[in-house]
From Swiss-Prot:
Transmembrane segments: none annotated. It comes from Cupriavidus pinatubonensis (strain JMP 134 / LMG 1197). This is Hydroxyacylglutathione hydrolase. It is an enzyme of class 3 (hydrolase). Binds 2 Zn(2+) ions per subunit. Zn(2+) 2 binds at D57, H58, D140, H178. InterPro entries: Clx_II_MBL, Glyoxalase_II_hydrolase, HAGH_C, Hydroxyacylglutathione_Hdrlase, Metallo-B-lactamas, RibonucZ/Hydroxyglut_hydro. Monomer.
Amino acid sequence: MLKVEPIPAFQDNYIWAIHDGRNAAVVDPGEAAPVERFLKDKGLALGAIVITHHHGDHQGGVAELLSAYPTTHDGAPMPVIGPAGERIGGRTQAVREGDTVTLPAPALQFRVLDVPGHTAGHVAYAGDLPGVGPVVFCGDTLFATGCGRLFEGTPAQMLASLDKLASLPGETRVYCAHEYTRSNVRFARAVEPGNTALADWEARVESLREAGQPTVPSTIGLERQVNPFLRSREPTVREAVKAQGGSVAGDAEAFGALRGWKDNFR
């Protein structure tokens, strides 16, 4: 049986630890110190490092972790798994769409999805974890009620990436890398003020944050109901985009206008 736990980092990052009570894989360790504290507090050995994309707040802790944990519990070189299309320090396994990642300790398997948009080579890791169920670790592509900025990709690429993630089973838990949900919900409410599922989710988000709890993971099923970036083809979203002066001439244009609105939303 596995557990997935957040390791807070920086101001609003989540490094994800997947562990079996003995060994842990960490996803997107932007800094090392919080990971080292977590491992020590839980009595865990580091078994693998998994990276979704090249930004420093996702891989900045890799070198320090490799210095502290050069090998796994059985003496093998520490695996560092990351996207083939990006520069990842210390990477031992380059992955792309269709690849399978298999780890011995903790015992788990992921299939790799190419999800360009936020960065050109961004990947996500989807799997079915014993004791957890279906999951996707999606970095900065899909957020709870939002999506990542388009730093390197196009609206068409990001839309296709989000469509790919939205096609996962509804019960899939979405482990994104930032606690942006409150601000994302504010924007979503501006886009779809009549969305009752979103109103319910807003109340839940406020309750969680007031209690100091993460709003992540969400689920793919919930995101389909409340996330404007998964709903950019909905008439309500299209009308809101048009009211802001955005083009809805095509799917990519409408998505790009929606993303541009969010970029400037206050």
